Amino acid sequence: MPKPKSTDALTLIGEPTFDRDGLIPAICQDTVDGSVLMLAWQNRQALEQTLATRRAWFWSRSRQELWEKGATSGNVLIVHAARLDCDGDVLLLSVSPAGPVCHTGDLTCWGDDAGPLLTRLARTIESRHDADPSTSYVAGLLHGARDQAARKIGEEATEVLLAVPGSQEQVEEAADVIFHLLVLLARDGVNPLRVLDVLAEREGLPPRALRGDA
């Protein structure tokens, strides 16, 4: 489960503008990859609780009560920053999710297809484990000799270097490098989101929670 790097309360710059019901929409965005995860509502108490605990709290309009995201499922949202839009009537919460955000089990409340490209691509590659290696190129790499999958990365990287600088060919060969790198990671049982963790930490960002289904 992700943990806040600091136990200090968050600070919100500006005064939020609540609607006639005392609510403000709060958009939750993944800190690392920028994907929009969910939208919920906060009243002043939920906002103050979020800032104080660095965990996402919301107001249920149907139940008329406060609720903490992930209190039951364990899929909490650790909040690293809270910002108001230019009009002060919409909140943006930068978060690290501890698992799928939607109650349906999807990565986002708009479905997995709305999730980050890397996650979707990794899932597609992972699904090829069950495919027939004789008819699936990816399955052949996943079940074949490791040297074969590793060699493809070198071959595609060479094509990048040989392509005309700035050309479409160079772009396409670079895409092949990334794709085959993901295949090798999947073959070795490495969640590619761990790569994002490393890059995030190098940028001074909090690492995202790893999703065990990629």
Q: In which residue ranges do the predicted regions lie?
A:
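Flexible "arm" and connector segments at domain edges
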Residues: M1-A174, I178-A214
